[in-house]
């Protein structure tokens, strides 16, 4: 068992009428299993990305830099926005290139996520770590715990499969092609066998 990892929180930097975020897609290494190092992908870190915090009716501007050495993208899953800012398979970011989307947040308060959506390799890149959570706040947000990482806990559940050397195995069996990829190890925020000790009586998991 090990302490639950909590992704860092990025609420952006407000200037020139928008809330600005700087996101770097990068390669890294992460220790999932004792004594083993695993090659991963991450956003502003080795594995997964920071939790982005948006506000409803606020304009956000994002600088997405692709430093992983292959084409990628970032898609804002569940958001209502123009197709030019969507980050879908039609908006590939070439290696060593930068994409600068911006949009008005029209979503109500909720929990969303962002992830690679590049053609042909989205599954593999997300499997290796190119994904993160988005929290949207609005003026009608109910009075529930909202102290991030203290009584408001992000829970990113993933199933993964590892080789004996700690490497991530993706679609490496025939049945994966037929029935879909299913790992044999559960992760929570990239942590195997996580433990959390609540410091409050009321705890929010999202």
Regions found by a protein language model. Name each.
Residues 1-206:
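Histidine-centered copper-binding motifs that mark active-site loops
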